[in-house]
A protein has these predicted regions:
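Gram-negative bacterial Sec-dependent N-terminal signal peptides
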Residues: 1-27
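A residue-level marker of the well-folded mature domains of exported/periplasmic proteins
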Residues: 3, 23-347
Length: 347
């Protein structure tokens, strides 16, 4: 059934141009399966809504699973999606290596795979993400502007997610000169298992204890880990210590308005979700990865060459909070909740 539907879609796309109308025509009766790594994180709700909206607009169907932070469950989830007869897969990998058998299974069934936001280090998966090295640079730049000298802590992402190291590389690019000059000392550094805020908080607490609270800045790799770091700092009366993040989670944007987080690099997941849906449908219709608009060849650290598309992030600080309100990402009320005499638009 899967292969028959894919062949039908290919036949349709062969006779149509790459317009939105043709994309909608080719998507009739197609189903895209999405495997989420951990849908409990706030961020993925927005991604899902964008994917659903794009699929529905094209006349395609959406089904999904949640691996609940389990690599083993993600493999069985993908098996389940394939058994349901999906025509393409979008996979947010829990573990970039452990998910490879799922890509093999998809290939065995003639199904295209979009590696969503996180690298799946396999040339058979199209890699769609933001420029995560640049995200790391943006995080470090914002914190460095606030604290040009002092003791830094690096709260990294999950050790099973290549994005954690991409981010860390970008952060180090920005900080290296100050480190070499002796202006900055990195007094603590830790990965955050599963990107879980509770793990980030525990790591931050341990570093604060080891350093007798002599910490001037925290470069945290996403808003969840930032939230954990802020909780640990607040418990020690250190709220207001510069902390970075990414994803523009509503709670993080509120922390920026309150002054307890310095920056959240906004990766508009509405754009990412829409792109993922459109790419999945195009690939299901027989389009080559190389023909995807904006696609480029990219080589991973392991030496694999993949087709990838990188979207551009935006750093959000107290200086430009209006941008997320103007874009409809967050309401002014949600942004400014509990804020008095804060930055615009909360003043």
């Amino acid at each position: 059934m899967v292969k028959i539907k894919s062949l039908m879609a290919a036949a349709v796309v062969a006779g149509l141009s790459g317009t939105a109308m043709s994309q909608g025509a080719m998507a009739q009766d197609l189903t895209v399966g999405v495997s989420w790594s951990n849908f409990q994180e706030e961020r993925w709700k927005t991604d899902e809504a964008a994917i659903k909206e794009a699929l529905e607009a094209a006349g395609a169907a959406y089904v999904s699973t949640d691996a609940q932070s389990s690599s083993a469950k993600q493999l069985s989830d993908v098996e389940s999606l394939i058994a349901q007869g999906v025509d393409a897969l979008i996979i947010l990998a829990q573990d970039s290596q452990a998910v490879i058998p799922a890509v093999q299974l998809a290939a065995d069934n003639g199904l295209p795979v979009v590696g969503y936001d996180r690298l799946i280090d396999d040339p058979r998966a199209f890699y769609l993400t933001f420029d995560n090295v640049e995200v790391g640079r943006m995080q470090a730049r914002a914190v460095l502007a606030e604290v040009p000298e002092g003791n830094y802590v690096m709260i990294k992402g999950s050790p099973t997610d290549p994005n954690a190291d991409f981010l860390r590389a970008g952060q180090q690019e920005v900080l290296q000169e100050a480190v070499d000059a002796g202006k900055i000392t990195i007094v603590g550094e830790a990965y955050t298992d599963g990107w879980l805020p509770a793990n980030a908080q525990r790591n931050m607490e341990q570093i604060l204890t080891a350093e007798d609270n002599a910490v001037d800045a925290v470069v945290a790799s996403n808003d969840g880990t930032a939230g954990g770091a802020v909780a640990a700092l607040t418990a020690q009366g250190m709220d207001g210590t510069p902390v970075s993040g990414q994803d523009a989670d509503h709670a993080a944007l509120n922390r920026i308005a309150q002054g307890t987080q310095t920056v959240s690099v906004w990766k508009d997941s509405r754009d990412l979700g829409r792109e993922a849906a459109e790419i999945a449908l195009a690939l299901a219709g027989g389009e080559e990865m190389s023909a995807i608009e904006g696609a480029e060849e990219w080589t991973s650290a392991s030496g694999n060459t993949l087709w990838a598309k990188f979207l551009k992030p935006v750093p959000v600080t107290a200086e430009n909070l209006e941008v997320v309100v103007d874009a409809g990402w967050i309401s002014k009320d949600a942004l400014c909740q509990g804020v008095s005499a804060g930055p615009a638009p909360c003043n």
